[in-house]
A protein has these predicted regions:
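Gly/Ser/Thr-rich phosphate-binding loop
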Residues: 1-52, 65, 148
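Residue-level signal for inorganic ion chemistry
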Residues: 13, 66, 114, 143, ...
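Alpha-helix/helix-capping structural signal
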Residues: 14-15, 80, 172
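Conserved ATP-binding/catalytic segment of the ANL
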Residues: 60-69, 73-128
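Adenylate-forming
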Residues: 81, 115-142, 174-188
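Core catalytic subdomain of AMP-forming adenylate-forming
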Residues: 96-112, 129-155
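Conserved loop-to-beta-strand segment in the C-terminal subdomain of adenylate-forming
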Residues: 158-181
Length: 189
């Protein structure tokens, strides 16, 4: 057992790297990831030790409701959601709709068991010329996870009919790969 009486961790604030979560899980230590915003009195969902799914932020806390808008945005409402921004009716109208749903600005999905998975930020999406919304951070993080030789990756395609990426390599990683593959001293340019 990890740390004597420690049974689990709770993670929030920023997305938890799934490799880290899986590593702790393999050691018998679950990290219960949660989700919330200042506008929802902090915690709104959390994985439970008895109902846990890696890669998600869990189920809604009691009294909270979640749904996904047509554009993929996560909407929430419940007793912990703010009534509005102080002295800022324009910002309130942008964040809360007439039915009391808080528009979080996050993109996500709810699976058939009710677990919420966050996938991106709405403001980070771009739209191709054929109308498809693309979440570049998913592509970027997946590619970087598959290729240890990449230093930076930028996916773009706003108003184009294709998506492309600008990739820069990690010089140290490439030199190491070249040495291991009989190409030491060769240029990677």
């Amino acid at each position: 057992r990890f740390g004597g009486r420690v049974r689990f961790f709770i993670s929030g604030s920023a997305a938890l790297n799934q490799d880290i979560s899986r590593w702790f899980d393999a050691m018998g230590m679950q990290i219960a990831e949660g989700y919330g915003m200042t506008e929802s009195s902090a915690a709104s969902t959390v994985n439970r030790i008895v109902a846990y799914k890696n890669g998600t932020v869990g189920w809604p806390l009691p009294g909270m409701e979640f749904r996904i808008a047509e554009d993929g945005e996560v909407l929430m409402r419940g007793p912990g959601v703010m009534a509005g921004y102080h002295n800022n009716p324009a910002a309130t109208a942008e964040a809360l709709d007439a039915d009391g749903w808080l528009h979080t600005g996050d993109i996500g999905e709810i699976d058939d068991r009710g677990f919420l998975k966050l996938t991106d930020r709405k403001k980070d999406l771009f739209k191709t010329s054929n109308g498809k919304y693309v979440a570049p951070s998913n592509i970027e993080s997946t590619f970087k996870g598959l290729c240890p030789y990449v230093s930076q990756l930028l996916v773009h395609g706003n108003d184009r009919n294709f998506v492309s990426a600008l990739v820069t390599l990690d010089p140290e990683a490439i030199v190491g790969w070249a040495a291991a593959n009989g190409m030491e001293g060769k240029s990677y340019a």
